[in-house]
Each structure stands twice: as C-alpha cells, then as structure tokens.
Amino acid sequence: MVQQAYEQLQRKGIGELEQMSIQMATQTRELLANLGPYPGASTEQVPEQETWTNPKNSGGGYGQAQLSHALGLAFRLQPQRVAEAFAFMSSPRNAPVELHDAISYKFANGAIGTLSGGSSHMGAWQNKDELQVRAIGDQGQFLIDLHRESAYFWYVDGTEINMKLPPNAGAVDNFAAANALVDVALGNLQANRAPGELGALTVEALELAYQSASLGKIAISKVKN
C-alpha cells in the first residue's frame, strides 16, 4: 500500500508542500508504563522492559517507539526537513517515559505541520494500529490512512485517484524491513526504500521535538540546509 502511494507521488506529486498532519495511535499504554508487553510481541524473545522505559536507553517514550515509524512514512511520501518544533508530551499512569505527544512543526520550505501520537487502550480497534498522513501542496493533496486501508489523491487539474486496496493492505509485516534490507544487500531491489536520508529526516524531527518538550519552548534546528 505504501509503495503504491509512493509510486503515485513519483508519477505526479502535489507540488510544494504547504501543510502536513500525521496522526498515530497504537496499544503501547502497558508497555511504556511498565505494566505489560506490546500486543503481538514475541513470547520467545522478550526484551528487557527498560529497553522501552529507561530514557537513558530509549531516548524517550512514544516518540521513539512509534512516531519514528509515522515520520518515516510521511517523509518517504513527502520528504521535507524540519526547521522548528514545539512539543507537549504527557506521561500519565506514572509512566517513566511519555505516552502521548502533540507536536507542531515548521518545515524548511516554510510549510507547517502537526504530529500527534497516542498510546491507545488494549483491545481498542482489536489492537489495530492507527496511522494517517495528510498533506496539502500547491498542486494537490493526498490522504494515506493505513488503519482504513485508504489512499486518496487530488490534483488542481481535476485529477482524482482513490486507490482500490485489498483488506489489511495497511497491516504491518514484521519481516518486511529485514527482508528488504537483505534484498538491498543482495542487489535484488532496484532501489533502497529506506535510504539514509530518510532516517536523517526522521531523527532530526524527533530530536527537535524532544528538545522542545524538555526546554518548554520552540526548538530550532542548528543544521544548515
């Protein structure tokens, strides 16, 4: 599903980004509050709890554990550097790391955006992840919703595309990333779908968010474009 959306945007993009909103919610309340595992986690290889909940190891909570995936998706589809960030982070249930995030971004090209992350209750939506990316550019807009298996594109010339996707098209394949890495190493893929540049954009966006939450003010990137 994501690759189909990426290929559509490569064929016809939405122009200069003006606004982007990213929303994610997953069942991490127990995990990040030291009260239980992540649903669907392997029972054979259980990581130490502090892998997730000791900030010295994890660097944070929901942002590091989950929003890294959301940002990776967003910047894969619409690459853009973050110039400024302002973030609120919440740690209910006496959690040692944050369970919820509300972040505002200003991108290097002047566009603005929001990133929202929430630790859902176990059992909600049958533990199905929620992840949505919406972007508006000067030549069109798109909405990618993995939870509802929806991919919609609209362009100023009147073109409208509503992709037909099978059930569970947005489901996570736990082995896909590892298999893709092996394929890249073997030369079996024409392109690396997770290049270093994508990782750098994601890390920079998260780093600024955590800086802002810690300082209580806008964090500004010191890296020149």
Please state what every model-predicted region is.
Residues 1, 16, 66, 99, ...:
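An acidic site on a long C-lobe helix of protein kinase domains
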Residues 1-93, 216:
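Predominantly a Rossmann-like dinucleotide-binding segment in NAD(P)-dependent oxidoreductases
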Residues 70, 143-147, 160-225:
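C-terminal helical cap and adjacent loop that interface with cofactors, partners, or active-site loops
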Residues 124-129, 153-164:
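A short, polar/proline- and glycine-enriched secondary-structure boundary/capping micro-motif
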Residues 22-24, 117, 165, 223:
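Active-site donor-binding loop signature of nucleotide-sugar glycosyltransferases
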Residues 65, 69-149, 176-189, 222-225:
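Contiguous beta-strand/loop segments that form the cofactor/metal-binding neighborhood of enzyme cores
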Residues 2-5, 29-36, 97-99, 127-128, ...:
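Short aromatic-enriched loop/helix-cap "lid" or pocket-rim segments at secondary-structure transitions
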